[in-house]
């Protein structure tokens, strides 16, 4: 074999090994608030998406916040950090990581509160896929399912009330009125709910732990059913419990979108601003719909909302 040809082959092998080493060094740490099904489902999707891009399973490590902090103390060298859930994000942000951070599985208000409480400006190496849907999309769903509705009812809690002006703008820009009540304490929940239901055609649920929780949702839904005021919820579990519809992103949708942001971080590209889910699903409670004289199809509603979002 000519010497020049041998040198060329050796150079090719060297480049190949260098590329392999670069991929193997592309470590991704996924920090889960806890090792429960919801967080693990999204972590599995992210892992599968990154493996399709060429990373191997050993390049991706799952941690709880405590485990990640121990790894950092031992000289952790992740190229990108993914946080799943509010507690994981808070713990990681508190350590001021140098690596790019992709946060997921927390609503926008929770994300912004944690950044605000950290005392830092939003770092340029930080982005997120929010858990909740944008207000405009939710109000558009209200108009699709209830074209004759005039007023949208909303219950605010201590955490969600910071979004009041944003939702009000989304509602009013679509030609609807808004009736809202701020629940300052648990004792005032049902008085606030009654005042909202008395003046509204639909109840738009906005996540807030003081308003919507496992201990309150059954009675809230019972009150809406008796008043014949449907709820547009943010979780499919609420549809099973008696809400008319819910709009939400699935673990697969959130995981795939987060993985796309991780890829940007691994490539050294600038991360985009925090974003809402691009994709979503809608669930319909057929029994509640029939009781209200409505004929709703989840797939048709989803397609119409997606089409509306793509229009200029």
For the regions a protein language model found, what residue spans apply to each?
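N-terminal secretory signal peptides that target proteins for export/translocation
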Residues: 1-4
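Bacterial N-terminal signal peptides
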Residues: 8-18
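Short hydrophobic alpha-helices and adjacent helix-cap/hinge residues
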Residues: 23-312
């Amino acid at each position: 074999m000519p010497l020049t040809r041998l040198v060329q082959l050796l150079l090719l092998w060297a480049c190949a090994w260098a590329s392999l080493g670069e991929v193997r060094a592309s470590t991704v740490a996924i920090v889960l608030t806890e090792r429960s099904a919801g967080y693990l489902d999204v972590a599995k999707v992210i892992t599968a998406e990154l493996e399709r891009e060429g990373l191997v399973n050993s390049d991706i490590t799952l941690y709880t916040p405590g485990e990640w902090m121990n790894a950092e103390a031992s000289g952790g060298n992740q190229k990108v950090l993914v946080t799943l859930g509010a507690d994981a994000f808070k713990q990681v942000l508190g350590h001021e990581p140098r690596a790019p951070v992709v946060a997921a599985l927390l609503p926008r208000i929770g994300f912004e509160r944690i950044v605000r409480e950290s005392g830092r400006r939003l770092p340029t190496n930080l982005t997120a896929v929010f858990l909740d849907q944008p207000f405009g999309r939710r109000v558009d769903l209200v108009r699709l399912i209830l074209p004759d509705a005039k007023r949208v009812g909303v219950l605010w809690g201590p955490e969600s009330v910071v979004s009041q002006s944003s939702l009000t703008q989304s509602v009013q820009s679509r030609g609807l009125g808004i009736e809202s009540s701020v629940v300052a304490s648990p004792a005032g929940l049902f008085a606030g709910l009654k005042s909202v239901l008395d003046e509204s055609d639909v109840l738009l649920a906005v996540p807030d732990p003081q308003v919507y929780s496992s201990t309150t949702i059954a009675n809230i839904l019972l009150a809406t059913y008796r008043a014949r005021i449907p709820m547009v919820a943010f979780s499919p579990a609420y549809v099973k419990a008696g809400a008319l519809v819910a709009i939400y992103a699935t673990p697969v949708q959130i995981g795939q979108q987060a993985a796309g942001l991780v890829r940007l971080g691994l490539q050294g590209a600038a991360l985009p601003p925090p974003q809402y889910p691009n994709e979503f699903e809608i669930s319909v409670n057929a029994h509640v719909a029939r009781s209200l004289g409505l004929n709703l199809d989840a797939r048709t509603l989803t397609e119409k909302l997606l089409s509306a979002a793509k229009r200029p």
